[in-house]
């Protein structure tokens, strides 16, 4: 009787600008505090595409082959000797950022700001668009039975929305402006509504995406064309009947940031989520004399348990955001689909024996 074939670890690897390959990597062995995961669902993020097209994002440069992917869920295959809270067969969502040391940022609970943090698919750290992947067990969270693998993978972008709404102080009764109806804008809309926002208006260039925003809960939408930032602000105020207390900017576009400052209520908060140019001209005086606080967002921290609770309780529904699914073997086709701007969230299915949501 022939021996069973050893499982392969097919992985999606970027070698440099425009050079994306499917390759077989060795199956890693988990350390004492790690788990080996059989990957199931991994979403494609804009950052993955940037590394593919440009080979870099800012100072993060692909200098050696790197496995992509960081929006992920999977099943525990093997546990390290010191892992007590997980066992083989557990379904988990993966928080991609795991601190390497207990530095000053970890001590105050803001580990996302740690300069030495491990983060999936950020050079030089490999991601998890592969069959098998090992990760710090403390940053793998068990999924309830009523939360699917795909919902588990969506916790990563959902966490950006949670962190942004926390930074903005979104609470009961607030009017909120969300600039941008891409995946991050959409999850921010969902979180703002779940946190008690009375009205949320979403702006975007795309009528199709704004239609989806209305479908998932936006109270108001505004399609942008060639208006000035001041005109956009006036239109937002006209729709809401007042200026929003919180604006969450998810595009990174300079004109959108400017509109956000003009639009936000005096004493309110503008949260910058989208990453654009390093240098951007903004009407800072207009923010200063009206005490509009401008806050940044870098990834997230302490969000996975909250996100899991929101999904399990059906406080948010991320399923409508998933528009395309591809097996890992067709990852190159999936990335081309993303590049063409088709769909919203594209999922890659990494387990050849389980392509279900």
UniProtKB/Swiss-Prot annotation:
Question: What is the annotated localization of this protein?
Answer: Mitochondrion membrane; Cell projection, Cilium, Flagellum
Name the chemical reaction catalysed here: xylitol + NAD(+) = D-xylulose + NADH + H(+); L-iditol + NAD(+) = keto-L-sorbose + NADH + H(+); keto-D-fructose + NADH + H(+) = D-sorbitol + NAD(+)
Kindly list the positions annotated as binding NAD(+).
184, 204, 209, 273-275, 297-299
The EC designation for this entry is 1.1.1.-, 1.1.1.14, 1.1.1.9
UniProt modified residues of type N-acetylalanine? 2
One biological process term in Gene Ontology: sorbitol catabolic process
Q: Which cofactor does it need?
A: Zn(2+)
State where substrate binds.
Answer: 51, 156, 299-300
Keyword entries, A-Z: Acetylation, Cell projection, Cilium, Flagellum, Membrane, Metal-binding, Mitochondrion, NAD, Oxidoreductase, Phosphoprotein, Zinc
User: Is Aminoacyl-tRNA synthetase included in the keywords of this UniProt record?
Assistant: no
Under the heading InterPro entries, the entry gives: ADH-like_C, ADH-like_N, ADH_Zn_CS, GroES-like_sf, NAD(P)-bd_dom_sf, PKS_ER, SDH-like
Q: How is the cofactor bound?
A: Binds 1 zinc ion per subunit.
Which positions bind Zn(2+)? Answer: 45, 70-71
Q: Which residues carry this modification: Phosphoserine?
A: 211, 225
Q: Which terms in the Gene Ontology molecular function aspect does this entry carry?
A: D-xylulose reductase activity; L-iditol 2-dehydrogenase (NAD+) activity; zinc ion binding
Question: Topology relative to the membrane, per the entry?
Answer: Peripheral membrane protein
Gene Ontology cellular-component annotations: mitochondrial membrane; motile cilium
Query: So what family is this one in?
Result: Belongs to the zinc-containing alcohol dehydrogenase family.
Assembly and partners? Answer: Homotetramer.
Reported function: Polyol dehydrogenase that catalyzes the reversible NAD(+)-dependent oxidation of various sugar alcohols. Is active with xylitol, L-iditol and D-sorbitol (D-glucitol) as substrates, leading to the C2-oxidized products D-xylulose, L-sorbose and D-fructose, respectively. Is a key enzyme in the polyol pathway that interconverts glucose and fructose via sorbitol, which constitutes an important alternate route for glucose metabolism. May play a role in sperm motility by using sorbitol as an alternative energy source for sperm motility.
Q: What is this protein called?
A: Sorbitol dehydrogenase
Q: What is the gene name?
A: SORD
